[in-house]
Amino acid sequence: MQENLRFASSGDDVKIWDASSMTLVDKFNPHTAPHAISSVCWSSNNNFLVTASSSGDKIVVSSCKCKPVPLLELGEGQKQTCVSLNSTSMYLVSGGLNNTVNIWDLKSKRVHRSLKDHKDEVTCVTYNWNDCYIASGSLSGEIILHSVTTNLSSTPFGHGSNQSIRHLKYSLFKKSLLGSVSDNGIVTLWDVNSQSPYHNFDSTHKAPASGICFSPVNELLFVTVGLDKRIILYDTSSKKLVKTLVADAPLTAVDFMPDGATLAIGSSRGKIYQYDLRMLKSPIKTISAHKTSVQCIAFQYSTVLSKSGLNKGCSNKPTAVNKRTANVSAGGGGAQNPGVVREAATTSIATVPPQPTAAAVGKGAVAPQDKAGLPRSINTDTLSKEAESGKNQDFSNFDDSGKSSLGDMFSPVRDDAVVSKGGDESIGKGDGLDFLPQLNSVFPPRKNPVVSSTSVLHSSPLNVFMGSPGKEENENHDLTAESKKMYLGKQESKDSFKQFAKLISGAETGNLNASPSSNQTRSPEKFEKPEKEIEAQLINEPPGNGSSTPNPKIASSVTAGVAGSLSEKIVDTIGNSRPNAPLSSVQIRFIQNMIQETLDDFREACHRDIVNLQVEMIKQFHMQLNEMHSLLERYSVNEGLVAEIERLREENKRLRAHF
């Protein structure tokens, strides 16, 4: 539960409560005393509270930073009884006894627009998720959608004049889903795109329903209360009633706490009940709040990103997260598009191609953010399960001994992982989904590789194969011997390349002044020794993208011919020159280019082999995953337990019917 979170309740006055302890923080009444306060709503930064009374005397904006102080009065004498703020708290919509819906500009303190489409008293108003539409309900049973951008109103829809609309709420996840409750106890979910019922829950309440509220963290859950003392929880997906509770008094108001686990419910006797959804048998706290009926309950908005906000995108408010707009993407806006109600909530997935980073990426990592703070991609698997466990993972501490995990070794989204000599680890995150279509972009061919003295972070497939239970022991012994040879060759190659670098630099400055005989005898040694050392170095060096290293057996066979031909070319070049002359800059450049081209060709060959290996591994992993799923589905169902569960269900039904 968020620290210092508060909620407001209205009845004969307005009271502000601490949500955790349910203790009174403050109370005030900015309206005419005899009349109840029918509607309250918080600003997005939780500093201001807007109230309206059942008499419609005026709309009052009060500051609640310290003590509640009325700051602004609007619509005096205009009979406005219900209010709602947009996500920026710059515009206020109100409706009331004069059948009019007014949109107020709080900056200029004037009516921005008046909508006179209703034929009877307006009972409730609310903004949609992106503040482009206003939904309003009336005593005549009409629901009208008003477009803020086009200044047009929809054709009235509803169930008829005998079903007065008492409360309207938009779903926080399914953007085109609007819930309504009416006097005859019917609860309806509307598809606002087609303005037709998505589902009717008939006869759920035996008396007028008074309030509806959608869960801020669970896209399937919503709750209604009514004067029949019932609290009913619903599942929007299966369109069924999940649970029904009966209180000890008629219920008049309901709201979810931003954590999604707690309900605050007001009654006609002035009491407020706090329910925990994890143990719904009885309220965990009950307080006597008002002398008259509780008209409205409104929680402050969460000042930290709620799970629903993370699941559905990022909010555009830097200071507070509105429960209504926590799931609006940063580029959100625009009118609603026609179509059916979306069963799955939309996710804010940008189409930015992955950029190469010096990092290793593991499956399930959340996408990194660019400089503007917008996520490049969102792992939908992570998002759908985030309510159960966090999925942000840091993959770090990859050393050059090849101690990486199986997923990192063969992950097709792994990018270049190169560190300098002084670096000990490589840390990063990247996209963890939709990897198969991006193989070409993730593994680009290296056109201009650069040979330097920096040490290269590499992961040997040896560690993966040695840990694999399906391999035979003789293969493990062969690979172990190969790895030892590779390691020794790597150590020798460092010394030989240092000598080779000194030789070239000395020739370039004119310091190679050896005798003819010594030069003739030493030159072949100097350039024949690197033949073996180049071979060892190339075996140990990873491909250009640093994603993996080739099999030592394959690499040794390929390298033998390449290194042999390269050494012969170098020796021939040195032998054709004059024995007592130092190497010219042209010869040195020619040798460097030969080495560079050979290494480049070898890298590309290794790169192709590794890509093919990884694709094959992905296929094998996918086949294994499908096989595991089929086995789990086959053996996870226990017939005895299923029969026992059915028996217990029948017994519960009988007990409920009798008791």
From Swiss-Prot:
Residues 508-522 have a biased composition (Polar residues). The modification Phosphothreonine is found at residues 382, 549. The modification Phosphoserine is found at residues 411, 426, 468, 515, 636. The keyword Repeat applies. WD repeats lie at residues 1-31, 32-71, 75-114, 117-156, 160-200, 204-244, 246-285, 289-332. GO terms for molecular function: gamma-tubulin binding. GO terms for cellular component: apical part of cell; centriole; centrosome; ciliary basal body; cytoplasm; cytosol; fibrillar center; nucleoplasm. Keywords: Cell cycle, Cell division, Cytoplasm, Cytoskeleton, Mitosis, Phosphoprotein, Repeat, WD repeat. It is found in: Cytoplasm, Cytoskeleton, Microtubule organizing center, Centrosome. PROSITE patterns: WD_REPEATS_1, WD_REPEATS_2, WD_REPEATS_REGION. Interacts with FAM29A. Interacts with HSPA1A and HSPA1B. Interacts with gamma-tubulin in a HSPA1A/B-dependent manner. Required for mitosis progression. Promotes the nucleation of microtubules from the spindle. This is Protein NEDD1. It comes from Bos taurus. The gene is NEDD1.
